[in-house]
């Protein structure tokens, strides 16, 4: 179901109901019915649909009404569109998508860019190396930025690391100063993952192409099934977060850092990235899928490749499905 697309509103009844309930307080069936212009029995049907389509937990208490088990911070078109438009980005806001990256690629095929896709939930969210990205409704931030890139390899090198830097600085500005980077583009807090990034290309990477930067940030999620690694969320550290404020802060950081990257390349941001790398000068193992290399992390090169000191010899690694882990 699509809520907003190019300024048009869909599925208004359900979204109006969620907006009323997002404060986490009790609302009577009469109050909800009057707001929606339907009977109390119809309200219950709407609520059942909300539960079915979003998996949100609802409480029904006789004499008090209905409330969500946890408050929500729904994405708000009125708050987001003006700022995105000022940056020159078209905003596409959805309730549920298969994947924000997949939708961004579909929109690119119709000739649109630059653009930002946001969704309340993903049914087939994707991370690096084909992993699932768990994407419950209204809990986290799922977004994809699609840009046109000219200049070939120079403009692409290090871009995923720059996006990670923008995400990390966003989290620090939101009140999480301990956020740090793990090569190539994950963001960690206290040894646990809080954000991941997936870059996908379409077109000719040697000349003109489009880049889709998919970003997932754990925001207000308390628990989740299907995550196979230690994770944390903003909520755990600073309490409930307004996801509109987070989205706008992230958009601003992305524009700042990507504009600088377009001007100076990754080399102009390399020192800042290395200063934030949580495993800098630590002994780690890099896996390529078929081989493993153990050594001390020296940093990154001017293209964003990982520099490892292996048996007294410095080597650089980039591209492919590489994975870095800390040696115990």
Segments (PLM) and residue ranges:
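Short loop/edge segments at beta-strand edges and connector loops
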Residues: 95, 181-183
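Conserved active-site carboxylates
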Residues: 186
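Long, positively charged amphipathic alpha-helical accessory segments at protein N-termini or as interdomain linkers
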Residues: 2-39, 45-48, 53, 152-179, ...
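N-terminal lobe of the biotin/lipoate ligase/transferase fold
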Residues: 4, 10, 15-172
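A short, compositionally biased micro-patch
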Residues: 61, 136, 182, 300-301
């Amino acid at each position: 179901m699509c809520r907003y697309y190019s300024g048009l509103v869909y599925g208004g009844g359900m979204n109006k109901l969620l907006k009323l309930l997002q404060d986490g307080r009790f609302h009577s069936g009469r109050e909800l019915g009057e707001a929606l212009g339907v009977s109390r029995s119809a309200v219950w049907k709407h609520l059942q649909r909300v539960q079915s389509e979003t998996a949100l937990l609802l409480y029904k208490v006789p004499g008090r009404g209905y409330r969500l088990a946890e408050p929500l911070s729904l994405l708000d078109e009125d708050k987001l569109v003006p700022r995105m438009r000022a940056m020159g980005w078209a905003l596409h806001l959805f309730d549920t998508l298969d994947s924000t990256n997949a939708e961004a690629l579909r929109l690119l095929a119709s000739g649109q860019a630059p653009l930002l896709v946001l969704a309340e939930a993903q049914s087939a969210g994707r991370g690096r190396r084909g992993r699932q990205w768990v994407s419950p409704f209204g809990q986290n931030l799922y977004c994809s930025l699609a840009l046109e890139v000219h200049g070939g390899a120079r403009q692409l090198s290090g871009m995923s690391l720059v996006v990670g830097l923008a995400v990390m600085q966003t989290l620090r500005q939101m009140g999480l100063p301990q956020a740090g980077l793990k090569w190539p583009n994950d963001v960690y807090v206290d040894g646990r993952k809080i954000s991941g990034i997936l870059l996908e290309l379409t077109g000719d990477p040697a000349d003109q192409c489009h880049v889709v930067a998919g970003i997932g940030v754990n925001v207000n999620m308390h628990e989740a099934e299907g995550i196979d690694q230690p994770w944390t969320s903003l909520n755990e550290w600073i309490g409930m977060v307004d996801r509109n404020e987070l989205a706008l802060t992230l958009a601003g950081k992305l524009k700042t850092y990507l504009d600088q990257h377009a001007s100076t390349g990754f080399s102009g941001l390399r020192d800042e990235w290395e200063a934030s790398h949580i495993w800098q000068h630590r002994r780690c193992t890099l896996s390529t899928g078929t081989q493993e290399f153990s050594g001390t992390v020296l940093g990154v090169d001017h293209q964003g490749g990982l520099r490892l000191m292996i048996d007294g010899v410095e080597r650089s690694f980039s591209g492919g499905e590489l994975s870095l882990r800390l040696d115990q």
